[in-house]
A protein has these predicted regions:
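Pore-domain transmembrane helices of cation channels
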Residues: 102-148
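Pore domain of cation channels
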Residues: 166-227
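Structural signature of hydrophobic alpha-helical transmembrane segments
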Residues: 30-43, 87-97
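Cytoplasmic-side transmembrane-helix entry/capping segments in multi-pass membrane proteins
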Residues: 59-69, 87-94, 117-124
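Long, low-complexity, intrinsically disordered cytosolic termini of multi-pass membrane proteins
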Residues: 235-254
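Outer-pore turret/helix-boundary of cation channels
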Residues: 28-33, 134-174
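Short, hydrophobic transmembrane alpha-helix segments
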Residues: 23-36, 50-58, 80
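N-terminal membrane topogenic signal
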Residues: 1-15
């Protein structure tokens, strides 16, 4: 566990919890309150791990703390339960936090000069963070404009996020990742104009991110390979005169 939480593998740690949150969320909600409580803990750990992943820069870390603090306060104290406006505040901060962490990791990826496994883990984390950010955004749209989504042909009248601490509605989380990957099964549909615009934007961002990420990683790998070749060539040029001198001395002795 110490190795898992080391600074070197902080993105791998975040990726593990984000993956679990995405996959286990619909399953846990089938177990009633026990499942919801476990989901609350998993969501909290995911937020803390996301905060830890950006802890390398003090200013960025402080900004992250300011964003995540209202989420914990309103969520764990229960003040946001059944309070519409406090709920909106909490989910707005949650959406902003996921977006902030995603942008922070993207900046880190762009600044890197070599391809490492942790860089690849970080790139995958951004993809999950974008999915969760949009999932919460869809929840906000549904709260503000009831009936914005249709699930299995049934138009939602109101999703009561405020009755529990769990932020992620399994249907909208599922819809978010399906949209992000442009699978488009059609079982969950956006109906209101804001919902349609948000889903269109997510599909565009999802495809652009993959394309730009691949281009960035290929560029880094190419420059890294060229740098190694130049370094090897430089060492050969430095060592060549020394080798020739040694060979000449050996021939003289013979």
């Amino acid at each position: 566990m110490i190795r898992l939480l080391s600074t070197r593998f902080k993105f791998r740690t975040l990726l593990i919890f984000l993956f679990l949150l995405a996959v286990i969320d619909p399953v846990l909600k089938q177990f009633g309150q026990v499942g919801l409580n476990f989901l609350d803990v998993l969501f909290t750990i995911s937020l803390l791990t996301a905060l830890y992943s950006i802890s390398g820069n003090r200013k960025i870390l402080l900004s992250g703390i300011l964003l995540v603090a209202p989420i914990f306060f309103l969520g764990w104290t229960g003040f946001a339960k059944n309070e519409f406006y406090l709920g909106l505040v909490m989910y707005t901060f949650a959406m902003a936090f996921f977006g902030f962490v995603a942008v922070s990791i993207i900046i880190h990826i762009v600044a890197e000069e070599s391809v490492t496994m942790d860089l690849i883990y970080g790139s995958a984390c951004v993809y999950f963070l974008l999915g969760f950010m949009w999932a919460i955004g869809y929840g906000l749209i549904e709260l503000l404009i009831p009936g914005s989504f249709s699930v299995g042909g049934h138009v939602l009248t109101r999703i009561d996020y405020l009755s529990q601490y769990g932020f992620l509605n399994d249907n909208l989380s599922y819809f978010s990742f399906v949209t992000l990957t442009t699978l488009g099964y059609g079982d969950v549909l956006p109906l209101s104009p804001p919902a349609k615009s948000a889903s269109t934007l997510e599909a565009i961002v999802g495809q652009l991110y993959i394309a730009l990420l691949v281009a960035r990683l290929v560029g880094l790998h190419t420059s890294q390979s060229m740098a190694k070749k130049r370094e090897k060539k430089g060492l050969e040029e430095i060592c060549k005169p020394l080798l020739e001198k040694d060979q000449a001395n050996t021939q003289k002795k013979q």
